Every structure is written in structure tokens, then in C-alpha cells.
């Protein structure tokens, strides 16, 4: 453990859900919320992520022609084992048949248990988008199906699918996510078939189920790739959609909507490829 760590505090007066989701897609060691501010801690510099955040906020200002006030503070602090302190705040969560728990909790009898590296809060099942995807996985994933997890993060969704008997491929634009997913797959005694740094555009085949739990803007940006990677009759699960962006996302996809799961402001959209095309 390093002697010092960096603490970043992100204070923003608008688009808070979007900003939190944006950061969760890029930082896997846990994000704390305190007094309406987001706090990220790391022994390595997160300056690059903060630069990306500033660029993202600038794009929101231009897109919505509005004012957004963003303040980022960075402090170097002595490391008094904040990781252990944070770990103790992580508790198990139950989503349908799945029971997601840190390593110091016992598995739950009668449930599909998923053990997550306790240093990882993102993708622990506590966020509404993760829970929506887990409910969709429980309903639609069958043994032997081929599934692609786009933006795999900590790997919790693809681990859940693998535990249901799916053949799983994973991808993420962040190489760290692939490393963390590998750790969690090993922790759970399951495997993914193939993983790559990149997105759906790099897929070499089509899948029975494609899952993308990412921010709405990115879903819209890669909509064509997500659809082209889904087999005829296949299922596309989209999450990370705030209610006010529902129609914007919906209009970008021409698959039929099977159902929508909503928790709070967050929507998980389940689509089916009824376009009558197959083959790549």
C-alpha cells in the first residue's frame, strides 16, 4: 500500500446522474456520495479521467445550450487504510435469484451467489442499472446462449450470465475493466470465452443476447454496432438510461421493445431483433 492517496471531489449543479454514470464507466474502485458531491479515491492519479469529465461536461453544455457549473478538487492524503474503511460499507444485495456479496459474507443457500472483489463498488448490484440488467438476465438468459457484455466493468453481469450457463464474451474500452473482470470471474469459478479492449464494433460474430449497461449518449453512439451484433430473434438489453433520455435512445434503435424495467429514474430496455436479417 502506498503512503499517500489522491481524493477527488466532484461538485456539479446539474446532470448529476449522468456525471455519476460517466464516472462509474471509467473508475472501478468505488464512488462515494456525500452532501451531493461525488468522491473518488485512488493511489494513482485520476487526472486523465477528470480531463475527460471536463470535456464531457463541455459537450453537455453545448448539446443542451445550458449552464453547468463543475468544480473538481484534488487532495493528496496520508493513506490510513481508506480501502478497508470503504470495504466495510459494502453489504450484500439480493436481486431476484442472484445474491451478490463481498468475500467476507457467506453465500446464501438457494440463491445464485456472485462474489465480488470488495474493492469494487461499481457493478456490485447496488446501482439501479445493474439491478435492472440482472433482472433481465434472470428472465432471458438460457443455458448455451452466446452473450456479449459490452462495457463489462467489474464483470458482474457476464458472471451472472455465465452462472446461468451462457457462453460469455466481454469487452470494454478500458483495459483495467478486463483485468478486474478476469479477477472476479476467477473468484466465482466461471470463465468467459473471449475478451477484448474495444466495443461491439470489434465483435467477430453475432450473439443471442447483447448487454450494454452504459450511459445513454454512448448507447446512441454505438447503436448500429449493438444491433448488428445481435442475432436475428436475439435480445438486446440496454441500461444506463435516465428516464428523460428514454425516447432519445428508443428512437435510435429499430428493434421491437419487449419490455422496460424502471427503478427510480433509471430504465433498462429489453429489445428483440425482428428485422429479419442474420449473418455478418
Swiss-Prot record:
Catalytic activity: L-lysyl-[protein] + 3 S-adenosyl-L-methionine = N(6),N(6),N(6)-trimethyl-L-lysyl-[protein] + 3 S-adenosyl-L-homocysteine + 3 H(+)
GO molecular function, one term: protein-lysine N-methyltransferase activity
Similarity annotation: Belongs to the methyltransferase superfamily. PrmA family.
Main localisation: cytoplasm
Record protein name field: Ribosomal protein L11 methyltransferase
Key words, A-Z: Cytoplasm, Methyltransferase, S-adenosyl-L-methionine, Transferase
Localization (cell): Cytoplasm
